[in-house]
């Protein structure tokens, strides 16, 4: 659903393991990596969208994960002009996302990328917490930095160090949902 400002509402998903690594997924038939994310349908809650996207993209359901935290507000990014479909109405200029921090509490064999008719990813890997900022497409890097900075205190119990190259000011702090 696109709002009056041209942003599509979206949930982003950060899945962690017991080594505090995150699941990074490779876009189908592309050399492009990102965290799972997806649109919030009309009338759908953030949590409903989270579980639908989690199942469609990664094959996991609520019994496989624990929800740790979320970002408290929408984090926005704009599409580069070449991504904007100017003839489509309403025009979507970017996405606004709320991000959820999850912990995988089941076996990673439950991760299945082919659970939906429209498969989005063809590979995945556990990576260092900060690596998604480097691997994601350039126009998403600032939102990844903002989101990972906001969620890090929850995952690392305030015992984290933000790498020096990430100098953007902290935009928000995570809301703890479960501990």
Curated annotation (Swiss-Prot):
Entry EC number(s): 3.6.1.-
Keyword Hydrolase annotated: yes
Pfam families xref list: NUDIX
GO molecular function, one term: mRNA 5'-diphosphatase activity
A GO cellular-component term linked to this record: cytoplasm
Motif (Nudix box): 38-59
Cofactor(s), names only, from the UniProt record: a divalent metal cation
Enzyme class: hydrolase
SUPFAM superfamilies in the record: Nudix
Name of the protein this chain belongs to: RNA pyrophosphohydrolase
Disulphide-bridged cysteine pairs: none
Domain Nudix hydrolase residues, every copy: 6-149
Purpose: Accelerates the degradation of transcripts by removing pyrophosphate from the 5'-end of triphosphorylated RNA, leading to a more labile monophosphorylated state that can stimulate subsequent ribonuclease cleavage.
HAMAP family: Nudix_RppH
Keywords assigned by UniProt, alphabetized: Hydrolase
InterPro entries: NUDIX_hydrolase-like_dom_sf, NUDIX_hydrolase_CS, NUDIX_hydrolase_dom, RppH
Keyword Hydrolase applies: yes
Lineage: Bacteria, Pseudomonadati, Pseudomonadota, Gammaproteobacteria, Candidatus Pseudothioglobaceae
Domain of life: Bacteria
BP-aspect Gene Ontology terms: mRNA catabolic process
Family: Belongs to the Nudix hydrolase family. RppH subfamily.
